[in-house]
Amino acid sequence: MMYKIVSIPGDGIGPEVVAGALDVLNAVAKKHGFEVSVEEHLFGGASYDVHGSMLTDETLEACKNCDAVLLGAVGGYKWENLPHDKKPEAALLKIRKELGLFANLRPARVYDALVASSTLKTEVVQGTDFMVFRELTGGIYFGQPRGYDETRGWNTMVYERYEVERIARLAFEYAQKRGNAKVTSIDKANVLEVSQFWRNIVHEVHQDFPEIELVDMYVDNAAMQVVRNPKQFEVIVTSNLFGDILSDISGMITGSLGMLPSASIGSEHALYEPIHGSAPDIAGQNKANPIATIASVAMMFENSFNRPEVAADIYAAIEGALAAGFRTGDIAAAGEAISSTTEMTAAIVARI
């Protein structure tokens, strides 16, 4: 079995954390007896400096013709003053659109060794492990009309039936794989007609999955419940705006953005990346936490390659390294020894 992966390290700490993730990828390939082909391309500011474009046709074509894309990070101070449509973030939106990535998956998983790193009490967060499915291409971020003038501003939240159906179906299918995990659909159906539509469609899709429990929850209550009792959630499915906010709230339960992977999924393509930024202030200093990018590789094996046993090995190796006391600066408590990017990577590879 050969997996064809496109690596786009990007900017800032991106090349460092992607290098660590590829070390882990090679380790699991050797253990499980499959081959990987990794093709590297420039993206973001790194591409702009060489080609005058944040996303070249060559890079985009490579991403369309691989099994999965692994992204490091994009952006930085150097490119902040470029026109909006030339910035790295615009290139990220373009690649998501071109690849048809309609679902963003963000896990909220608290590792036992890092329970104390959360700002919440241990008894509240210990055992937390849920997945947020955020619709990525519809909703208020893309609806028309939109704009503002001197007296008012306006945006439009719109969802098509197919957009709600496909994200709901993806969430229910994932819940099946997790032993018929409970699905919580989050909306604002008490005041928004588009949320009433969302709820109706989710319930229609649920009829194909009668063995799965479905719970409806208003977004304001959900924000409170994620902090009050995060263990009640197993799978969350929600719209673009609500998912944008809730996934960040959920992520901080874990204690550091450096721990959090993500996946953007489409019908034919998928892109995996850490949720942290490019952190130009520590770039090139061997200080970055590679765990989010390494865990993104685990998500790749779960979702794109249907190899949960490979993903489980990666998660276990991460847990083992943390249990052994390895800590990068972002997750180290006062007085704890700080590991470099390469030291943390080596500790995880050794436990594959």
UniProtKB/Swiss-Prot annotation:
Q: Where does NAD(+) bind?
A: 76-89, 277-289
Q: Which PANTHER family match?
A: 3-ISOPROPYLMALATE DEHYDROGENASE
Reaction(s) catalysed by this chain's protein: (2R,3S)-3-isopropylmalate + NAD(+) = 4-methyl-2-oxopentanoate + CO2 + NADH
User: Signal sequence: where?
Assistant: none
Q: Where does substrate bind?
A: R96, R106, R134, D220
Subunit (UniProt): Homodimer.
**Cofactors, names only:** Mg(2+); Mn(2+)
Q: Does the keyword section mention Lyase?
A: no
User: Which HAMAP family does UniProt cross-reference here?
Assistant: LeuB_type1
Reported EC number(s) for this entry are: 1.1.1.85
What does the UniProt function comment say about this protein? Answer: Catalyzes the oxidation of 3-carboxy-2-hydroxy-4-methylpentanoate (3-isopropylmalate) to 3-carboxy-4-methyl-2-oxopentanoate. The product decarboxylates to 4-methyl-2 oxopentanoate.
Q: Do you know which InterPro entries this protein is assigned to?
A: IsoCit/isopropylmalate_DH_CS, IsoPropMal-DH-like_dom, Isopropylmalate_DH
This protein's pathway: Amino-acid biosynthesis; L-leucine biosynthesis; L-leucine from 3-methyl-2-oxobutanoate: step 3/4
Q: What is its main location?
A: cytoplasm
Query: What is the source species?
Result: Chlorobaculum tepidum (strain ATCC 49652 / DSM 12025 / NBRC 103806 / TLS) (Chlorobium tepidum)
| Domain of life, per lineage | Bacteria
Keyword annotations for this protein? Amino-acid biosynthesis, Branched-chain amino acid biosynthesis, Cytoplasm, Leucine biosynthesis, Magnesium, Manganese, Metal-binding, NAD, Oxidoreductase
Q: What is the lineage of its organism?
A: Bacteria, Pseudomonadati, Chlorobiota, Chlorobiia, Chlorobiales
The record's subcellular location field reads:
Cytoplasm
Record site: Important for catalysis: Y141, K188
Q: Write down the top EC class of this protein.
A: oxidoreductase
A Pfam family the protein falls into: Iso_dh
UniProt-recorded name of the protein: 3-isopropylmalate dehydrogenase
What's one GO BP annotation on this UniProt entry?
L-leucine biosynthetic process
SUPFAM superfamilies linked: Isocitrate/Isopropylmalate dehydrogenase-like
Q: How is the cofactor bound?
A: Binds 1 Mg(2+) or Mn(2+) ion per subunit.
Q: Name one GO cellular component term.
A: cytosol
